[in-house]
C-alpha cells in the first residue's frame, strides 16, 4: 500500500471514530441551542416545552425584527421529542375521523343541492360548473392508456404486502402484490399485454390506515395502498401532472410558487392560501361533480374504498383518496387550481395568476374572500394561520418572505445525539445567519459555542454549501483532510453505514429492465399481442435483458461511515512558470 493510501485510510479511521461518538450533554441540547440563539438576539428564551409549540409571531416591525420573532415561533415547532403528555396518535385519529365526518356532510350537501325558487346558483355552485368545464377541456374525457402506462411504476414506500424495509421496487417486482376488486381488470390487462411476470397476492377492498410522526402535538395519518393499485395510481398522477403544465402549473418545480410568494410580499397583489387536512377533505361528491365521467370511473377503480385501522376496525371512505395514494397530490392540485381559476374568472380577474402546488395556492389577493366562500361550500377548511392576503408576509413551498426579505426559518426536528445530528443543526444555523453572504455576529457566537461539542477532527472538516450535510459548511481550501487528485479536490463526509440487503434476483432484473424500458421506449412498458411487439421489439427487449444488472439494495446499520466525495476543482493559475524552454505547471512545482 502506498503512503498516500495509508495516510488516507488513517485519516478515514480517525474521522469514522469521531463520527460514531455520542454528544453527551445535560438537558435538552436542541432547546439549549434555540434559547441561546434567542438570547443572542435579545429575545426572551422559552420557559417551557409547551411554549415552544404554541408561540405566535407578531407580523409587524422591520424585516430584521420580524425575522427573529418568526424564528422563535418556528424553530422548535416541529420538534418530535417533547414530553407534553399528549397522545399524539390519538389526536391524529381524532382528526382523521373528524375529516371523514365532514366529507360525509359534504357528500350529502353536494349530491342534494338546495336551489332557490328562482334557480339562481350560489357562488359555490357556479364555480363547480365552471371548474367542471375547465377540467374537461384540460384533461379530456378519459385518461389515455398509453399515457398511463408511460407513468406507471412502483414507488419506494410500503404497500399492504411489503413493509417499508422491503419498499424498493425490486422487492415489489419479486413478490406478488395485492389489488382491490375494481383494480383487478387493470392488472389482468397488464398481464395479458406485457412480458413482465405479473402476480397477485390478494384481492381486497382495504388499504391500511396508519400514523407517522409529525411533531410533539400530533401524528399524521396516511394510508398504505395495495401494490398494484399504487402502480396504476402513479400512472394517473403522471398524466395529471403533465396536463397541469398547460395551466402554467409545474408540480416538479416549487420555485414558481416561491418566486410568486416573494412578489406578493412586495406588491401585496398576490395572496398565499393554505388548507387544513386538504387531502382528507376531497369528497367523493366533489370529484364526481368536477371530473368527466370516464376519469371519475378510473379514479374509483384504482382507489381503496375501505381502510383497516390498527385496532382492526374498518372505515368506508367518504373521500376519494388520502395521503399515500399515488394520485392524491396531482388530483388535489387540479381541483384547487380549477376552483381558484373559476373564482378569478367570475371576478373578472386574470386566471393565469393562479398557481398551485398541492394545497399551496397563490392567486390575486382580492379573490381570497370569494375563494374562502367556495372552499367552505365544497368542504375545504382554509388554514387561517397560514393564509396571507394582506400585510407584508407571504409563505409558500417552504419559502417565507416579509416585505421582499427572505425570513425563512430553520427547524430543529429531532433530538441531537450524534455528531451528524449536531452538524445538521449547525449547518442550518449557518445558512440562516449568512442569508446575505456575511455571518451575523450575534449568531456566530452561538455557532462557535456549540461547534466545540464536536470532535476536533469534525470541527476542522468543512465542505462548500450545496454538497449536503455530511460535514460543516465552510471553505474547502482550509480543510486539512482534503485530498487532491489531478485537478479535482476530494473531501470526506459522514454517511450512513449500510450493508447489502438480500434480494430476489428476479425482482432486481425486472426492476432494471422496467426502468430501461421507460427511459428507452416512447410507449413505456413493452407490450405484446396484435398491436404490441414484433420480432424487432422482442430482440430489443432481449438486448435490454442482457444489459440489465441486479439492483443493489442496502440498509442502514445505525452507524456512520466516511466517504470521500469530489466537491470542486482545484483553484490554481491556468498557466505555467517558464524555466528556460521548459514549462513547469504550478501544481507540479
Curated annotation (Swiss-Prot):
Q: How is the cofactor bound?
A: Binds 2 Mg(2+) per subunit, Ca(2+) is used in crystallization to prevent RNA polymerase activity.
Q: What is the effect of changing residue 413 to A?
A: Loss of RNA polymerase activity
Gene Ontology MF annotations? metal ion binding; nucleotide binding; RNA binding; RNA-directed RNA polymerase activity
Q: What is the effect of changing residue 274 to A?
A: Loss of RNA polymerase activity
Outcome reported for the amino acid change (mutating residue 345 to A): Almost complete loss of infectivity
Span of domain RdRp catalytic: 259-391
* Outcome reported for the amino acid change (mutating residue 500 to G): In strain: QB_2 and Qbeta_2_FR
The outcome of changing residue 214 to A is: Loss of RNA polymerase activity
- Known EC number(s)? 2.7.7.48
Q: Does the keyword Membrane belong to this entry?
A: no
Needed cofactors, names only, are: Mg(2+)
User: Does the keyword Ribonucleoprotein belong to this entry?
Assistant: no
Instruction: Please give the annotated consequence of changing residue 360 to A.
Output: Loss of RNA polymerase activity
Q: Which reaction does it catalyse?
A: RNA(n) + a ribonucleoside 5'-triphosphate = RNA(n+1) + diphosphate
Kindly name one Pfam family recorded for this protein.
Answer: RNA_replicase_B
Tell me where the transmembrane regions lie.
none
Task: Indicate the impact reported for residue 359 to A.
Answer: Loss of RNA polymerase activity
* Residues that coordinate or bind Mg(2+) 1: 274, 359-360
Keyword list (alphabetical) reads:
Magnesium, Metal-binding, Nucleotide-binding, Nucleotidyltransferase, RNA-binding, RNA-directed RNA polymerase, Transferase, Viral RNA replication
> What domain of life does the native source organism fall in?
Viruses
Q: Which InterPro entries match?
A: DNA/RNA_pol_sf (IPR043502), RNA-dir_Rpol_cat_phage (IPR007096), RNArep_beta (IPR005093)
What processes in GO biological process is this protein linked to?
Answer: viral RNA genome replication
Miscellaneous comment: In order to produce high amounts of RNA polymerase catalytic core, a fusion protein consisting of tsf-tufB-replicase with a cleavable linker between tufB and the viral replicase subunit is frequently used.
Function according to Swiss-Prot or TrEMBL: This is the catalytic subunit of the viral RNA-dependent RNA polymerase complex. This complex is involved in viral RNA replication that produces (+)-stranded genomes via a complementary, (-)-stranded intermediate. Binds RNA cooperatively with the host ribosomal protein S1.
Q: How does it assemble?
A: Homodimer; the replicase complex can dimerize. Part of the viral RNA-dependent RNA polymerase complex, the other subunits are the host ribosomal protein S1, EF-Tu and EF-Ts. S1 is needed for the initiation of genomic RNA (+)-strand replication.
State what protein this is by name: RNA-directed RNA polymerase subunit beta
Amino acid at each position: 500500500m502506498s503512503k498516500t493510501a495509508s495516510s488516507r485510510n488513517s485519516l478515514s479511521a480517525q474521522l469514522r471514530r469521531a463520527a460514531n461518538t455520542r454528544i453527551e450533554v445535560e438537558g435538552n441540547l436542541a432547546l439549549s441551542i434555540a434559547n441561546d440563539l434567542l438570547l443572542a438576539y435579545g429575545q426572551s428564551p422559552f420557559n417551557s416545552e409547551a411554549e415552544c409549540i404554541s408561540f405566535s409571531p407578531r407580523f409587524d416591525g422591520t424585516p430584521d425584527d420580524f425575522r427573529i420573532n418568526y424564528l422563535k415561533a418556528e424553530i422548535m415547532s416541529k420538534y418530535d421529542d417533547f414530553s407534553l403528555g399528549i397522545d399524539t396518535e390519538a389526536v391524529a385519529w381524532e382528526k382523521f375521523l373528524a375529516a371523514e365526518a365532514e366529507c360525509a356532510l359534504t357528500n350529502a350537501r353536494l349530491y342534494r343541492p338546495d336551489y332557490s325558487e328562482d334557480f339562481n346558483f350560489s357562488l359555490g355552485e357556479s364555480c363547480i360548473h365552471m371548474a367542471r368545464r375547465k377540467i374537461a377541456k384540460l384533461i379530456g374525457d378519459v385518461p389515455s392508456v398509453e399515457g398511463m402506462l408511460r407513468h406507471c411504476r412502483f414507488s419506494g414506500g410500503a404497500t399492504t404486502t411489503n413493509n417499508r424495509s422491503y419498499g424498493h421496487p425490486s422487492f415489489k417486482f419479486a413478490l406478488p402484490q395485492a389489488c382491490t376488486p375494481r383494480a383487478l381488470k387493470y392488472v389482468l390487462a397488464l398481464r395479458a399485454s406485457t412480458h413482465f411476470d405479473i402476480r397477485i397476492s390478494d384481492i381486497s377492498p382495504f388499504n391500511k390506515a396508519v400514523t407517522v410522526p409529525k411533531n410533539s402535538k400530533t401524528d399524521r395519518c396516511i394510508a398504505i395502498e395495495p401494490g398494484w393499485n399504487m402502480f396504476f395510481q402513479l400512472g394517473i398522477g403522471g398524466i395529471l401532472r403533465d396536463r397541469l403544465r398547460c395551466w402554467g402549473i409545474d408540480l416538479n418545480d416549487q420555485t414558481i410558487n416561491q418566486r410568486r410568494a416573494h412578489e406578493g410580499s412586495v406588491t401585496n397583489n398576490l395572496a398565499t392560501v393554505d388548507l387544513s387536512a386538504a387531502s382528507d377533505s376531497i369528497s367523493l361528491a366533489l370529484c364526481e361533480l368536477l371530473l368527466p365521467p370516464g376519469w371519475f370511473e378510473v379514479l374509483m377503480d384504482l382507489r381503496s374504498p375501505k381502510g383497516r385501522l390498527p385496532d382492526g376496525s374498518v372505515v368506508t371512505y367518504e373521500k376519494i383518496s388520502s395521503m399515500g395514494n399515488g394520485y392524491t397530490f396531482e388530483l388535489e392540485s387540479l381541483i384547487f387550481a380549477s376552483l381558484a381559476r373559476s373564482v378569478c374568472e367570475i371576478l373578472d380577474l386574470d386566471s393565469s395568476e393562479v398557481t398551485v402546488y398541492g394545497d399551496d395556492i397563490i392567486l390575486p389577493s382580492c379573490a381570497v374572500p370569494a375563494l374562502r366562500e367556495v372552499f367552505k361550500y365544497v368542504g375545504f377548511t382554509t388554514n387561517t394561520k397560514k393564509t396571507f392576503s394582506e400585510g407584508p408576509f407571504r409563505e409558500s413551498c417552504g419559502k417565507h418572505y416579509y416585505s421582499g426579505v427572505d425570513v425563512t426559518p430553520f427547524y430543529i426536528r429531532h433530538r441531537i445525539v450524534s455528531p451528524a445530528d449536531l452538524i445538521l443543526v449547525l449547518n442550518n444555523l449557518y445558512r440562516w445567519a449568512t442569508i446575505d453572504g456575511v455571518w451575523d455576529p450575534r449568531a456566530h457566537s452561538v455557532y462557535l459555542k456549540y461547534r466545540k461539542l464536536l470532535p476536533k477532527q469534525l470541527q476542522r472538516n468543512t465542505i462548500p454549501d450545496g454538497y449536503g450535510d455530511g460535514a460543516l459548511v465552510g471553505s474547502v481550501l482550509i480543510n486539512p483532510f482534503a485530498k487532491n487528485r489531478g485537478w479535482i479536490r476530494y473531501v470526506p463526509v459522514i454517511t450512513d453505514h449500510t450493508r447489502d440487503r438480500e434480494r430476489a434476483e428476479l425482482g432486481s432484473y425486472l426492476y432494471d429492465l422496467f426502468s430501461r424500458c421507460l427511459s428507452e421506449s416512447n410507449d413505456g412498458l413493452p407490450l405484446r399481442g396484435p398491436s404490441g411487439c414484433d420480432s424487432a421489439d422482442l430482440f430489443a427487449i432481449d438486448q435490454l435483458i442482457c444489459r440489465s444488472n441486479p439492483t443493489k439494495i442496502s440498509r442502514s446499520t445505525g452507524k456512520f461511515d466516511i466517504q470521500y466525495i469530489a466537491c470542486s476543482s482545484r483553484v490554481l493559475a491556468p498557466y505555467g512558470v517558464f524555466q528556460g524552454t521548459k514549462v513547469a505547471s504550478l501544481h507540479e512545482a
